[in-house]
Amino acid sequence: VASKNGNEIALLDSDGQMKKFSVSYPIVDLEVAKQGVIALILHGDNGNYIELYDAAQKKLVSIKVTSDQNGYPMDIDLSSDGQNLLVSYLVVDGINVKSRVALYNFGQEGEDSGDQMIGGFDFKDTVIPKVSFMGDSKAVAIGDDQMIFFKVGKTISKKQTISFDKDVSSVAVNDDYAAFVFEDQKKTDQEKYEAVVYNKTGRKLMSHKFSSEYNKLLLGEKELLLAGNYHCSIVNFAGHEMFKKDFKKRIVNISPTGKRQKYLITYENSTNLSEIY
């Protein structure tokens, strides 16, 4: 747990024990691997830093990245084994804008490269605000008009690109699926939104059109949850709405538990573990 632009980090283990430590610069982004390795992007005085810490708060790696050389970091994701870090950069050169997706390795391949970077790609005239691993051997980069799938190994290679013809409103990604809500600006009432789910090979699994306003998109166990301030619905991967409910209390947050139809719902003054069906 860390506050954006702060310097303090609190790491909770499975037993509820908390460890706290501080870093030198304000935190821009943070990711944690399953075994407790922490990857950070820090905002320094003359550039940004990518730093890696183990579960005992020992600094493993510190890499300085500057806007002139690399661009501005937009998003990061750490592989579950803590060995690979995926970074999306926004590169501005005069009036030209491009995105750069870079893969860093903290094992032998990264050491051999000199700067830990083992591969990357540039994408012209697009902004990529989200990158995510889908397991340790595959990854996805999501831009404002496209989605790019990668294979990750000793380097990174492009496998497939899917272009979008509608505005991306929301994104959710896990190890197996990438879910989107697209907004059709031409429609103002019925079926303004379209929820779409892809698997990690890029195959479209389902499409579901809806009109109700929402502010949160979640991927559950082969189901999609769409939540607004006072309502939520669950759509299965066949595109059928299985559940729809209005709540009396305002929903602040909903989090999946990893079990089908079970979600942790946070209201303004309470939190409940609920089975939604």
Question: At which residue positions do the language-model features occur?
Answer:
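N-terminal "mature head" segments of proteins
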Residues: 1-7, 11-13, 19-23
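Residue position within the beta-strands of beta-propeller blades
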Residues: 2, 40-41, 86-88, 141, ...
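Hydrophilic extracytoplasmic domains
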Residues: 155-156, 163, 169-175, 182-277
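Solenoidal tandem-repeat scaffolds enriched in leucines and small polar residues
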Residues: 40, 45-147
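Structural motif
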Residues: 7-11, 46-52, 93-105, 145-151, ...
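Short loop/turn segments that connect beta-strands within beta-propeller blades
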Residues: 13-16, 53-58, 106-109, 152-155, ...
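Repeated scaffold domains used in trafficking and secretory/extracellular systems
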Residues: 1, 25-36, 69-78, 118-134, ...
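A short beta-strand motif characteristic of beta-propeller blades
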Residues: 15-22, 59-66, 112-122, 156-162, ...
